[in-house]
Every structure is written in structure tokens, then in C-alpha cells.
Amino acid sequence: MSGFNFGGTGAPTGGFTFGTAKTATTTPATGFSFSTSGTGGFNFGAPFQPATSTPSTGLFSLATQTPATQTTGFTFGTATLASGGTGFSLGIGASKLNLSNTAATPAMANPSGFGLGSSNLTNAISSTVTSSQGTAPTGFVFGPSTTSVAPATTSGGFSFTGGSTAQPSGFNIGSAGNSAQPTAPATLPFTPATPAATTAGATQPAAPTPTATITSTGPSLFASIATAPTSSATTGLSLCTPVTTAGAPTAGTQGFSLKAPGAASGTSTTTSTAATATATTTSSSSTTGFALNLKPLAPAGIPSNTAAAVTAPPGPGAAAGAAASSAMTYAQLESLINKWSLELEDQERHFLQQATQVNAWDRTLIENGEKITSLHREVEKVKLDQKRLDQELDFILSQQKELEDLLSPLEELVKEQSGTIYLQHADEEREKTYKLAENIDAQLKRMAQDLKDIIEHLNTSGAPADTSDPLQQICKILNAHMDSLQWIDQNSALLQRKVEEVTKVCEGRRKEQERSFRITFD
């Protein structure tokens, strides 16, 4: 055993110790024990050889041991070991509570850990345990059991007793044993522990250097490294199931485990030197879970005069693998983030374009809405004007009817008196003047219509011409020619005047020259 230890059997091992233990040949007990033998660890004082003690025969006994003579000094728990079970157990002796009338084996096994009623139930629950050292503890145990030579078969289902080597399936509590071949736990084990294979102590000859591979990955609480000679794995829900391997690395377990120390995170190589041998431990197995730092199990029937191997801190192996996987994960995450960023930028660009179009359409709609509103106001005004005009026309029509009503009796009176009234000269002139006024009025109306037509024609002709109309193009060409001809005419008139002036000057000079010639020759 290594580390801070309150109990355990075996030879003095490496660690912090203040005394030299005697060589013990009793069967070791591992687990949660307050009785200390000659083991290494944090001890003050050295116990003597263990004395024999009679196991208790009560149903719930506290394993009263025969105290041995102690040496003087300041010691912590130097109780002697009995040939029976050690540790904190309830009813380790002959069980009074037996499920079948079977005889208990005379040789008591080493109940490991915290055992409740470790009676020998051989035929009660359809399981047979054949062991050279003793019967494996049954019941609710928290520690690994002893090493068994012959494999035993266990029935599947809900079992409280475990065979030595068979693979129990289902809900299993306290099933333990050894197997020649390593198996991996299939479900949630609570304490897969590996017994330590340590180097020989000072009282034994040189032993071969055992090499075991154990690795612990995950959160292990107060866990230490122990080498494993053999391994046995259980399937199902097990509490404190030891895992021992023979020549092969133990498989990793995952889940909540009340495991014994013997698991380290990563791959580590540790060399511890005892009196005659060197143990090199290379961790390769991995266990993940929640560990409560139970002590490793020493094989039953083998003296524990061995030195425990101390494991170095976990190496960078597992961290490197995890870093590689995490780096790949980060790269994939970065690529996904970049892809999503590009897609987001593209979508944002499209969204901005569509938002710009929608904004333009919204402005157009707002402007058109304002125009429609103003047009509606104008239409309302026109409707009001039309209503007033209709009222005025109705008023005029009513006045005209009244006037006609007033004129009709007067016309009748005039017709009655027409035969007696003679037309005078003034009346004839008035009639002519009236007819002339009617003619002038008709002519004015025609002139107004003609002026209206002329104005409309001028408006249509003054409008910008259509450039695509060929007539308009021809008109433009003709206008350009006309302008050119006018310019030529104006310039030709100027040239004509200049030519006439030059001609006059030439004629005058010619006459002067002729006159001078005549004077000279005369």
C-alpha cells in the first residue's frame, strides 16, 4: 500500500513511515480498515507479529480482535491482525442469517472493504464459489474481494453475491472476482478498482520486475496508481468491483465510481526502488468517473511484503490527444463561423438592397398619397363650386320662369291691340337697330370661335416637336437651308457693294493714268 494509510496488511512499502514493520504472513485485507499491520504509509510505531483472534459469531458484530502486545512509542492504530477478516464489517463470522442450510467453510475469507453480513451463501442464491483461500464475501460490500482460482458462474439478474470469474449481468452489488482474461465493464460501475502489483520488500529475495499498464482519464478524487496482475470486469450496476488483469492492460471504465486508487490521468512511467527490485509502471488503461480513493486489493493468499509503486504526475499523452481533437473541433467551428459570416454578409447585402428598393417605393407611395390627398381636396372644392353653380342656375331658371309668367299676359295684350296700333318712324328705327345688334352679336360670336381655333392651333404648333417624326426632320433641314440661303444673300450683297467700290477706284485711277500718259506724249 502506498500513500496515507490507516490500515492494510503486507510488508513495509514505500511512503512516509516512522517504523519498520514485521513480516506478516497473514492474508491481506484491503478497503476501509482501521487495523494496521506492517504496511508502509503514514505510521508512527511498529506493530508486532499478528496474533490470532476468534471471529465473532454474532449476526452484527464489530469484529473484536485479540489485542497483541505493542511496543512502546507513539503509534497510530497498531492493532494486530486476526486470521479472519479485517476491516469494518458487520457479522464476518459464521452467519446466523442464512438463506439455506449449508455449512460455512472453515477457512474464512478476507472480507475487503465495508462488508455487511459476509456469510457464506453457497447454495441459497444459486451461486457456487470455489476458492482455495476462502469464500468470497457476499452481501453489500464496498471493497474488492479475494482472488479465486477456479471460476464460478453466477446467475444473471438482481444478485447480491458475486462469482469469482463469471460476468454477472444486471443489477449487481458487491460482485467481485478474478479472471484470466480482461473484460470491459458495459454499464455504470461504481468502483472498478485494480489491485496493486508491487515489488518485493526487504525481507524477501529479489523479485521480478512486474510491469502493469493503468491509466485514469477523467476526474479522479485522491486516486493513486497501482499495477494490475489480473482483471475482472462486471456488467451492470456494481459497487466496489475489482478489476484485475493478467498480462493485459485493463479496459477503461466510465461513470460514477467508488473506485480504489490505481487510476491516473494520462500516460505516466514511474520507477520506485525497494530493497531488491524495481517496479516500472506504465499507465495505459483509462477509468473515468468519481473516485473516493479506496485502497487497492492485494491478492488473497499472497503475502503483502511488497513495496508500492508511486506514480508520477500525469504525462502529456492524453492531453495531447484531447488537444488534437479539440483543435480539430475548433478548426471546424472556425470554418463554420466563417461560412456563416459570409452567408450573413451576403444576406445583409441582399437585405440592404431590398430595403433600399422598399424605401424608394415607400417614398413614391408617400408622394403619390400626398398627391392623391391634394387632388381629393381639389375635387371636393370643385364639387362645392359645382353645387353652388347648380344652385345659381336653378335660381336663374326660376327667375326666367317668373319673367315668362310676367311677359305672357303682356304679349297677349299686345296681340289684341296690334290691329289698332300703327308703327311710327321711331319704332321702325328701333327694329332696324335691334336687327343690326343681333347681326353684330352673331359676327362677334363667330370671331370669338375663330380666335379660339387660332389659339389652339398656335398652341399645338408651338409645342415641342417630336424628333421621331420624319416631317419634323425635313422641316428642320429646310429651315437650315433657308438660314444658309439668307446668310449667303446678305453676304453677297455686301460683296457686291465692295466690288462696286473697288471698280470705281480702279476706273478713277485708270482715268488719271490715261490723262498723265496723254500729257507726257503730247
Swiss-Prot record:
Residues 169-179 have a biased composition (Polar residues). The keyword RNA-binding does not apply. Sequence repeats lie at residues 6-7, 44-45, 76-77, 114-115, 142-143. GO terms for cellular component: centrosome; cytoplasm; Flemming body; mitotic spindle; nuclear envelope; nuclear membrane; nuclear pore; nuclear pore central transport channel. The modification N-acetylserine is found at residue 2. Residues 6-143 are annotated as: 5 X 2 AA repeats of F-G. Glycans are attached at residues 373, 468. It comes from the Eukaryota. Residues 169-215, 260-288 are annotated as: Disordered. O-glycosylated. Contains about 10 N-acetylglucosamine side chain sites predicted for the entire protein, among which only one in the C-terminal. The inner channel of the NPC has a different redox environment from the cytoplasm and allows the formation of interchain disulfide bonds between some nucleoporins, the significant increase of these linkages upon oxidative stress reduces the permeability of the NPC. InterPro entries: NSP1/NUP62, Nucleoporin_NSP1_C. GO terms for biological process: cell surface receptor signaling pathway; cellular senescence; centriole assembly; centrosome cycle; mitotic centrosome separation; mitotic metaphase chromosome alignment; mRNA transport; negative regulation of apoptotic process. Residues 328-458 form a coiled coil. PANTHER family: NUCLEAR PORE GLYCOPROTEIN P62 (PTHR12084:SF0), NUCLEAR PORE GLYCOPROTEIN P62-RELATED (PTHR12084). It is linked to Infantile striatonigral degeneration: Neurological disorder characterized by symmetrical degeneration of the caudate nucleus, putamen, and occasionally the globus pallidus, with little involvement of the rest of the brain. The clinical features include developmental regression, choreoathetosis, dystonia, spasticity, dysphagia, failure to thrive, nystagmus, optic atrophy, and intellectual disability. Essential component of the nuclear pore complex. The N-terminal is probably involved in nucleocytoplasmic transport. The C-terminal is involved in protein-protein interaction probably via coiled-coil formation, promotes its association with centrosomes and may function in anchorage of p62 to the pore complex. Plays a role in mitotic cell cycle progression by regulating centrosome segregation, centriole maturation and spindle orientation. It might be involved in protein recruitment to the centrosome after nuclear breakdown. This is Nuclear pore glycoprotein p62. It comes from Homo sapiens (Human).
